[in-house]
């Protein structure tokens, strides 16, 4: 008997998942997509299986704006294990070196200012960056080490929360592209004892905070009680990740032309930059960019939700 193809739902919005330990970001996405029975889905930047915390999952029209969440600042809490280094920079790797830990809280506090602000990082071999089409982590697993260019990132916040024995808990606020494993390794080297990431939890992604997240267990429970549609209450609007952007309202006439690809003027538009756009019914219809002549050019449009 032929298997009946599952008809997926055309739904749009964002679910803020507290990614569980041990899941890849894609595995978590596909699990939630299955629970929702959503037609289209995407996430906004990978979290390592070791990491937990804020993972915005985009569905339907919201996937058009996932890049802007990917580009946003992030926040983390991490536990730094001092005295050892591993080949992956975290607790899942093989120990490469063990050293005595002769530093304490005061030493760490004195060192942290060196790592605040703009810094340079060399991406780790165990990362998803590609060389000639191959992810670096695959090369690393094959025993290869290739040269990586340093990249500039910004550490907006770096605070020591706790220090006990050979472990220290740090709070980090950073720009996109920052590798917390590399940051911890570099701090460990500067302390003279080496270090790796023992725990990692993302506390913020753009405007989204940990307190807004839902767990996989909560989603599974809702699905068990009410099916796919029971999860719809967890969906946030597609423009939730853009709330810090200026909002521009268009008249019915202007919205018609804007939705057909034409730049239009709006009385409440800023002088420059990206904006959220809504129609005369206060319905989000896409994002635009204010051009030099003051008109708003459409950049990403959404279908009626």
From Swiss-Prot:
Q: Per the record, what are the reactions this protein catalyses?
A: uridine(55) in tRNA = pseudouridine(55) in tRNA
E.C. code: 5.4.99.25
UniProt keyword annotations, A-Z: Isomerase, tRNA processing
The processes (GO biological process) annotated in the record are: mRNA pseudouridine synthesis; tRNA pseudouridine synthesis
Q: Which GO terms describe its molecular function?
A: RNA binding; tRNA pseudouridine(55) synthase activity
Q: Which domain of life is it from?
A: Bacteria
A Pfam short name: TruB-C_2
Q: Return the InterPro entries for the record.
A: PsdUridine_synth_cat_dom_sf, PsdUridine_synth_N, PUA-like_sf, PUA_sf, tRNA_psdUridine_synth_TruB, tRNA_sdUridine_synth_fam1_C, TruB_C
**Which SUPFAM superfamilies does UniProt cross-reference here?**
Pseudouridine synthase, PUA domain-like
Q: Which residues form the active site?
A: 48 (nucleophile)
- What family is this protein classified in? Belongs to the pseudouridine synthase TruB family. Type 1 subfamily.
Main function = Responsible for synthesis of pseudouridine from uracil-55 in the psi GC loop of transfer RNAs.
Protein name per UniProt: tRNA pseudouridine synthase B
The gene is truB
């Amino acid at each position: 008997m032929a298997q009946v193809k599952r008809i997926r739902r055309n739904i749009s919005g964002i679910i803020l998942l507290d990614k569980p330990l041990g899941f890849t970001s894609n595995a978590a996405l596909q699990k939630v997509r299955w629970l929702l029975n959503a037609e289209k889905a995407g996430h906004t930047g990978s979290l390592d299986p070791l990491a937990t915390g804020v993972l915005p999952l985009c569905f339907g029209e919201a996937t058009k704006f996932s890049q802007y969440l990917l580009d946003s600042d992030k926040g983390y809490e991490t536990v730094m294990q001092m005295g050892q280094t591993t080949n992956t920079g975290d607790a899942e790797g093989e120990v490469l070196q063990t050293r005595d830990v002769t530093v304490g809280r005061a030493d760490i506090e004195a060192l942290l200012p060196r790592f605040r602000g703009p810094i340079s990082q060399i991406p780790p071999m165990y990362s998803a960056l590609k060389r000639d089409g191959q992810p670096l982590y695959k090369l690393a697993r094959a025993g290869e080490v290739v040269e990586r260019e340093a990249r500039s990132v910004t550490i907006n916040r770096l605070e020591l929360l706790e220090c006990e024995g050979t472990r220290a808990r740090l709070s980090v606020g950073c720009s996109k592209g920052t590798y917390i494993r590399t940051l911890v390794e570099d701090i460990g080297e500067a302390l003279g004892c080496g270090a790796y990431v023992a725990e990692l939890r993302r506390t913020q992604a753009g405007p989204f905070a940990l307190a807004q997240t839902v767990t996989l267990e909560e989603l599974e429970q809702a699905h068990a009680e009410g099916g796919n549609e029971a999860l719809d209450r967890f969906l946030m609007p597609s423009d939730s990740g853009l709330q810090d952007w200026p909002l521009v309202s268009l008249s019915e006439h202007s919205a018609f032309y804007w939705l057909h690809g034409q730049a239009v003027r709006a009385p409440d538009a800023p002088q420059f930059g990206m904006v959220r756009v809504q129609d005369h019914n206060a319905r989000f219809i896409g994002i635009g960019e204010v051009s030099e002549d003051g008109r708003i050019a459409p950049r990403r449009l959404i279908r009626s939700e």
